[in-house]
Amino acid sequence: MKIGVVGLGLIGGSIFKALEALNYDVIGVSDSQNGLQENISNDFNNLKDCEMVFVATPMNKTLDVLQKLEEYLPKSTIVADTCSLKEFVSNKNYKYNFIPTHPMAGTEFKGFEHSFKELFEGAKWVVCNRGLAQEKNNSLA
């Protein structure tokens, strides 16, 4: 399974590192970490073959990223955000399968350099329901 992560700060970086440790094919998209590794760039086109994409950008950029992803992803792609607020991202219909989520994890630090693969171990992860049509996607998430 190919999984994308947009935004490689503490949360996105930790998702990225955890998935890599589990041997998933992971693609990172980040302006600040562009080129850090072979599988990290700032090119959204690299996400087009992903079955799932996590959006872990700062809240003020999340809606723009979710809209931009519509240009690159097929409608079968599952996209999950990690914002702590849900209404502003949930009130829109997207071309792909969107699941609003919120990981209940973090530290006092920010940035990829402070991310670590164990951040979510033992943590709760809230998955918000957007209706019965989303049940299949929620089970995949």
Could you describe each region identified by the protein language model?
Residues 56-58, 83, 129:
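Glycine-rich, N-terminal phosphate-binding loop of Rossmann-like dinucleotide-binding domains
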Residues 33-37, 88-89, 134-136:
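Short, charged/polar "capping" segments at the starts of alpha-helices
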Residues 27-29, 80, 99, 126:
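Hydrophobic/aromatic beta-strand patches that form the interior of the parallel beta-sheet core
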Residues 92-141:
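Rossmann-fold dinucleotide-binding core
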Residues 44-73, 78:
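Rossmann-like NAD(P)-binding element
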Residues 1-44:
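NAD(P)+-binding Rossmann beta1-loop-alpha1 motif at the extreme N-terminus of oxidoreductases
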Residues 64-113:
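Rossmann-like NAD(P)(H) cofactor-binding subdomain of soluble oxidoreductases
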